[in-house]
Regions:
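Extracellular/periplasmic periplasmic-binding protein-like sensory domains
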Residues: 249-325, 399-401
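Venus flytrap/periplasmic-binding-protein-like
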Residues: 84, 131, 138-141, 213-214, ...
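Short, low-complexity disordered leader/linker segments with a strong preference
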Residues: 1-38, 400-402
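Extracellular/periplasmic Venus flytrap/periplasmic-binding protein
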Residues: 89-93, 100, 138-141, 147-253, ...
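Immediate post-signal peptide segment of exported/extracytoplasmic ligand-binding proteins
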Residues: 23-40, 68-77, 168-175, 343
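Extracytoplasmic "Venus flytrap"
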Residues: 27-60, 82-89, 111-112, 179-188, ...
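Beta-alpha junction/loop-to-helix N-cap segments that form part of ligand/metal-binding clefts
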Residues: 25-27, 36, 51-57, 68-142, ...
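Segments of small-molecule ligand-sensing domains
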Residues: 311, 315-324, 334-393
Length: 402
C-alpha cells in the first residue's frame, strides 16, 4: 500500500515536470531560431523621399548595438532593409520577397502611407505583423479591420487638428493656403485640418494646391499660394519639397505664418537645405528629443544616441532628427520582443505589441508614454507644439493629448 502511494507520488511529480516543460516550450514563427529573429522592412533609399532612408540605417545601427550586448533573450535581431524607391509597386515586390523568400517573422517600420496601403491587405491576409509603420495615417489604428497592422507615431489627423485649434485660438481671421501631396498621406492631413477648423474651414482656407511625388519642384504651387492672398501656410510635404517650399516662399517675399508637418522637421534634412534664416518662425509639433536642442546636451538618452551613432552609424548625421526617431521606434520594438520571451510567433508579437503599458522611451519628450491595448493601436498620443528659432526647435505650451 505504501509502495503504491510512493509510485503515485513519483508519477504525479513526473507529470508535473512534464507539463512544466511543455508550458515552457519554445514557440517559433518563421524567421526565428535559438540565435536569431529575422525581420524585414522597405525604405526609400532612393527616389524623391530618399531623405527618409536614414531611418532604416539608424534602426539597423541600434539593433547592432543590442546584438553586441547579447541580443534579446540570447537572439540577435536581423533586420533586412530593402529599397523601394518610395514606389508602392516596388514596395509590394520587396515585401513579398521578405515574406515568401526571406521568411521574416514580421515587417517593421516600412515607410510611407501609399507604400503601406499597398501591402496592408496582403500582410493581413497572410497574418504577418505590419508593425510600427513609419507613417502617421489614421488608418493604421483599426484593429477590427486590420488586426495585423499597427502604427507608432501620432496620427496625421491628430497633428493637423492641433494646428487648426492653434489658429482658431491665436489667429481666427487667418487666410490659409495649403500645399499637400496628392495621395492618402496628404489627404489625411487635410481632413484632420478641416475637421479641426470645423464650420470655419470653408472661410479660412482660401487656397489648396497639390503636388505629385514625381514632380521636380513645388515652386509654381508656392507662387499660386502667394497670389491667393493667404497669410498662413500649411506645408504638408516630404523633406525634399518642404525645403523647396520654405526657400521659395522666402525668396519671393511671401512671409506667411508657416505650419510644417512633423514628417519634415529635420534640421539637417530640411531646414538647413532650405536655409536656417528662412526657416525662422516655423511651427510644428514634436514628440522626440531634438538632438540639435542645447536643452538636451547633458541628457543621458541623447548622449547614448550620439554614442550609438558614432560607433554604429558614423556616416549618419547626428543632427538629423530622423535618426533619433528611428532609434526610438527600435527601442519600442526591443520592449515588444522582450515581452515575447520564448513565444516568438506572429500571434504573440501582435499580442505583446498591443500590451504596452506606460512605456517610457528615453528619447521621447518628457511626460510622453506609450500605451497600447487590443482596441488601441495608436502607441503615441501625446505631442507638444514647437517653433524654430533659427538654430533649433523650441517647445511651447503643454503636452497635448489626442
Amino acid at each position: 500500500m505504501f509502495a503504491t502511494k510512493r509510485w503515485l507520488i513519483v508519477l504525479t511529480a513526473l507529470s508535473a515536470i512534464g507539463s512544466g516543460a511543455a508550458f515552457a516550450e519554445k514557440k517559433y514563427g518563421p524567421g526565428v531560431t535559438d540565435s536569431e529573429i529575422k525581420i524585414g522592412q522597405t525604405m526609400p533609399y532612393s527616389g524623391p523621399a530618399s531623405a527618409y532612408g536614414t531611418i532604416g540605417k539608424s534602426e539597423i545601427a541600434y539593433f547592432k548595438m543590442i546584438n553586441d550586448q547579447g541580443g534579446i533573450n540570447g537572439r540577435k535581431i536581423n533586420l533586412i532593409s530593402l529599397d523601394d524607391s518610395y514606389s508602392p509597386p516596388r514596395t509590394v515586390e520587396q515585401i513579398r520577397k521578405l515574406v515568401e523568400e526571406e521568411q521574416v517573422l514580421f515587417t517593421f517600420q516600412t515607410l510611407g502611407t501609399a507604400a503601406n496601403t499597398a501591402i496592408q491587405k496582403y500582410l493581413n491576409a497572410k497574418q504577418v505583423p505590419q508593425l510600427f509603420v513609419a507613417t502617421g495615417a489614421t488608418k493604421w489604428g483599426d484593429p477590427t479591420r486590420f488586426p495585423w497592422t499597427m502604427g507608432w507615431q501620432p496620427t496625421y489627423q491628430h497633428e493637423s487638428q492641433i494646428y487648426a485649434k492653434y489658429l482658431l485660438q491665436t489667429k481666427p481671421d487667418a487666410k490659409i493656403g495649403v500645399l499637400y501631396q496628392n495621395d492618402d498621406y496628404g489627404k489625411d492631413y487635410l481632413k484632420g485640418f478641416k475637421d479641426g477648423l470645423g464650420d470655419k474651414a470653408a472661410k479660412m482656407i482660401v487656397a489648396e494646391v497639390t503636388y505629385e511625388p514625381s514632380d521636380a519642384t513645388v515652386d509654381s504651387q508656392i507662387v499660386t499660394l502667394q497670389g491667393s492672398g493667404a497669410d498662413t501656410f500649411f506645408n504638408i510635404t516630404t523633406p525634399k519639397f518642404a525645403a523647396q517650399a520654405i526657400r521659395k516662399s522666402y525668396d519671393i517675399g511671401w512671409r506667411p505664418l508657416q505650419l510644417l508637418n512633423v514628417v519634415s522637421t529635420s534640421v539637417a534634412a530640411v531646414l538647413q537645405p532650405a536655409g536656417l534664416e528662412k526657416s525662422v518662425g516655423l511651427i510644428s509639433i514634436g514628440y522626440v528629443k531634438d538632438p540639435t536642442d542645447p536643452l538636451w546636451k547633458d541628457d543621458k538618452a541623447v548622449k547614448d544616441y550620439l554614442a550609438i551613432m558614432k560607433k554604429y552609424y558614423p556616416d549618419g548625421n547626428t543632427n538629423d532628427s530622423l535618426n533619433i526617431y528611428g532609434m526610438s521606434v527600435a527601442q519600442t520594438l526591443v520592449q515588444v520582443l522582450k515581452q515575447c520571451g520564448d513565444d516568438l510567433t506572429r500571434e504573440n508579437v501582435m499580442r505583446q505589441a498591443a500590451n504596452l503599458k506606460d512605456l517610457e522611451i528615453p528619447t521621447l519628450l518628457p511626460g510622453i508614454r506609450i500605451n497600447t491595448s487590443p482596441t488601441d493601436f495608436y502607441p503615441i498620443e501625446q505631442v507638444q507644439l514647437i517653433r524654430f528659432d533659427g538654430k533649433t526647435w523650441v517647445r511651447f505650451g503643454e503636452l497635448l493629448t489626442r
